[in-house]
């Protein structure tokens, strides 16, 4: 059991991310990385195994299989993560960030801080408004790439799970304007992830270097540290 605070020494330790939140973060990170690599290979097979007379070396089929496995893993983990964010008691401090998101003054102070023109604002939750807005944008991207990925899946696999998904998602395929548009949206959304990842890493590193009281460490340990006030 993780304690909420450790009052020994000159710092107090506060739990910022629960174990499930941290595990889901890294599962999604690995899944997104694998999906990007395999997705680009599926779109443009840049490696081809040496041809032989035996039914082996199906590299394209292997890439597609891994793409599907990690795609469904991303969907499952994201659904559970959204559930935790809304209902889990351990995520109360994350939900509190919503009040900073709708506060114009907090937005102003946070942007001023990013421009090195002012101190870091006091926040009610874990995320500052820019972080929470980016996190919500990421959820929209995951939703979009998941829906388009499911549509592409059932257009290849017509029986079993594919038949069930076809009955549910076919109206969305029509709404998107057909399979060609779905594939284009899926590909464009992939590039949105490619852009998001280095920006996310840079901002997380910048924030950790400027305010070394947890930062990136917290997504590993779960804790953030604050100086004690006597």
From Swiss-Prot:
GO MF, one example: iron ion binding
Keyword Transmembrane: yes
Membrane topology field: Multi-pass membrane protein
GO cellular component terms attached to this protein's record: plasma membrane
Gene3D superfamilies cross-referenced by the UniProt entry: Transmembrane di-heme cytochromes, Chain C
NCBIfam families assigned: CytB-hydogenase
Name under which the protein is recorded: Quinone-reactive Ni/Fe-hydrogenase B-type cytochrome subunit
């Amino acid at each position: 059991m993780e304690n909420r605070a450790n009052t020994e020494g000159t710092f107090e330790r506060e739990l910022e991310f629960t174990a499930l939140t941290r595990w889901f973060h890294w599962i999604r990170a690995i899944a997104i990385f694998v999906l990007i690599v395999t997705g680009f290979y599926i779109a443009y097979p840049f490696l081809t195994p040496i041809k032989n007379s035996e039914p082996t070396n199906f590299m394209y089929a292997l890439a597609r299989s891994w793409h599907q496995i990690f795609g469904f893993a991303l969907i499952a983990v994201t659904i559970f993560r959204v559930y935790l964010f809304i209902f889990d008691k351990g995520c109360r401090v994350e939900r509190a960030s919503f009040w900073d998101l709708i506060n114009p003054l907090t937005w102003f102070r946070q942007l001023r801080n990013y421009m090195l023109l002012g101190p870091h604002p006091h926040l009610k939750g874990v995320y500052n408004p820019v972080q929470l807005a980016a996190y919500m944008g990421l959820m929209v991207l995951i939703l979009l790439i998941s829906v388009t990925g499911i549509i592409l899946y059932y257009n290849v696999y017509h029986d079993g799970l594919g038949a069930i998904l076809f009955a549910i998602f076919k109206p969305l395929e029509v709404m998107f304007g057909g399979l060609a548009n779905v594939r284009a949206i899926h590909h464009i959304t992939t590039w949105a992830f490619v852009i998001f990842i280095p920006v996310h890493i840079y901002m997380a590193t910048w924030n950790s270097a400027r305010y070394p009281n947890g930062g990136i460490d917290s997504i590993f340990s779960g804790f953030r540290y604050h100086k004690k006030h006597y």
